[in-house]
């Protein structure tokens, strides 16, 4: 599964994101977490894990997805929810 990246938009998910990222440790996948600039708590939760963190440039779920997808370097990607 090294050819896949999970794109995880995470807006105000500081409680649920660590649970999801702990479960994902079982798999050999890359992870891109897209966080709004003003969401410091989710950033602090995410930075403890092996993942790429991107701060969202524009508001909205679609914008977060687009920005995350454009950052993917693997052959495949999957959209994954931060709340499990």
Give the role of each language-model region.
Residues 45-71:
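Conserved donor nucleotide-binding strand/loop of the catalytic core
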Residues 81-84:
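The conserved acidic donor/metal-binding loop of glycosyltransferases
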Residues 3-5:
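Cell-envelope/extracellular polymer assembly enzymes that use nucleotide-activated donors
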Residues 12-26:
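Short, well-formed alpha-helical segments that are part of the catalytic scaffolds
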Residues 12-16, 38, 61:
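Donor nucleotide-sugar binding loop of glycosyltransferases
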Residues 77:
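Short aromatic/hydrophobic "clamp" motif used to bind/position activated sugar donors
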Residues 35-43:
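A conserved acidic beta->alpha catalytic loop
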């Amino acid at each position: 599964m090294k050819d896949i990246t999970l794109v995880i938009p995470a807006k105000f998910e500081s409680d649920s994101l660590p649970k999801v990222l702990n479960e994902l440790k079982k798999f050999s996948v890359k992870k891109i977490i897209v966080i709004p600039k003003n969401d410091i708590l989710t950033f602090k939760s995410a930075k403890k894990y092996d993942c790429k963190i991107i701060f969202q440039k524009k508001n909205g779920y679609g914008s977060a997805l687009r920005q995350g997808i454009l950052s993917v370097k693997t052959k495949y990607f999957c959209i994954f929810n931060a709340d499990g």
